[in-house]
Amino acid sequence: MNVLIIDNFDSFTFNLYQYIGEILRAERAPFNVIVKRNNALILADIDTIAPERIIISPGPGAPDDPAYFGICSDVIQTWGKHTPLLGVCLGMQGIAHVFGGKVGRARVPMHGKTSPLWHDGAGVYRGLPQGVDIMRYHSLAVEATSLPDCLTVTSLVHDTHGTTNAHDFASVVQNMAENVEIMGIRHREYPIQGVQFHPESFATEGAKVMLKNFLFGH
């Protein structure tokens, strides 16, 4: 399996590289994990790499600024239509931006803090219990009211911890209370997923489960 990680100049990128390598090595199948900076790629290079999975890393800045997001928007628009793609933190914000969503200041900036996660049990969350702790490093967030119809909310954090099953999760998503922050999105048609938190952090519970689901869940 060829996996391309596009690095948005973030220190967490190496963690992603390490985790992905460990997961694939355990499967005892041939693999190649390639890391490229977002300003060191053109689309023709990706054609040559021929990735079977693409991960867009965290990073500083905002997704509407090419100085920070580089080629990533073009990759989402082109390769994301047919190749499973996971956006992490800035990567998720970029997915929302590309499809017409807005990214603004987070309700509460979170840097190096954990929160319990509530999710839909599908995609990267398959087999993951509700309420797992996830590590957050972000001051920007996807604005819930701006999310286009082509994207669905797959996970969130909120101040009251009563959500314990998919039915309740769906109700919270439908109402999108003010104390809710979107932590995950998925495209309804294309194999594109995004997570606002850091699955590559040691403090995120079930991190390798999520990444393995991304790698082999298609």
Report residues per predicted region.
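Extreme N-terminal starter segment of soluble prokaryotic enzymes
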Residues: 1-4
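A short beta-strand-loop structural module common to alpha/beta enzyme folds
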Residues: 29-41
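Acyltransferase
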Residues: 201-218
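Proline-aspartate-enriched helix->loop->beta-strand connector
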Residues: 38, 46, 50-54, 199
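Generic structural signal for residues in well-ordered beta-strands
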Residues: 33-35, 103, 153
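Catalytic beta-strand/loop cores that center a nucleophilic Ser/Cys/Thr
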Residues: 123-189
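A short, Lys/Arg-enriched amphipathic alpha-helix followed by its capping loop at the start of a domain
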Residues: 19-30
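Cysteine-nucleophile active-site neighborhood
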Residues: 51-133, 211
